[in-house]
Structure formats: structure tokens, C-alpha cells
């Protein structure tokens, strides 16, 4: 993956999911923050509060293919990545449902992917201007 080989070093990210991240990313100026990337992916929680009850629900909009790629990475990490399994166990003990845990995990993965893409795009841009 010549576009951003660092993505393949992340646990749970394969060639297909990395390609989807790059396709959705498109270029450096398209997405201005990691929150915007999460919103684009549909993994940013939406407030669904009522009265004194403060809740968040899943966002069903956004780039569904990007969301599916994040979901695939999350499932892979839950099965094979020890740190993610420990995180899920801790959140279960806190009373979170498996759906909430996956939502939080997908948001964290989106943050991690955004940082990798942003760093790669900046270094590639600097190399292009230096040449």
C-alpha cells in the first residue's frame, strides 16, 4: 500500500480496510479534524438526551463503507488484540453494553486512523514541496 503503508501496521487493519480509509480520506484539506472524520464515518455519538437523562445514540448517517471498515477493524481487534479485549472487559465492568463498547471503540479507531492519515499527508506534502 504505497499511499499510506503506516496504516497496515495498526492492529486489525488489512489491505482492503486501509484502502477504504484512504478512499474516504481523499486528500489533506477534505477533513479538518478528527471529529469531522468520525462524523464522516458515522461513529461520532449523537446526543439523545431528554429531561434529566443524558444519553448518546449511534449515528446512522455518514459514509457507510467507511463505517463498515471501522467496524471490521473493531471486530478484528476484539478477537485478536489483547489491549482491546482488556478495554472491552473494563467497559463491561463499568456497565456498558456491547453496542456501546463497539461505538466507543470505533470512535477511538477513527481517531487513530485520522492521526495516521494526517501525519502521512503532511510528510508527503513536505517532501513534495522540498523536491
Locate each region found by the language model.
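A detector of single, family-specific signature residues
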Residues: 1-131
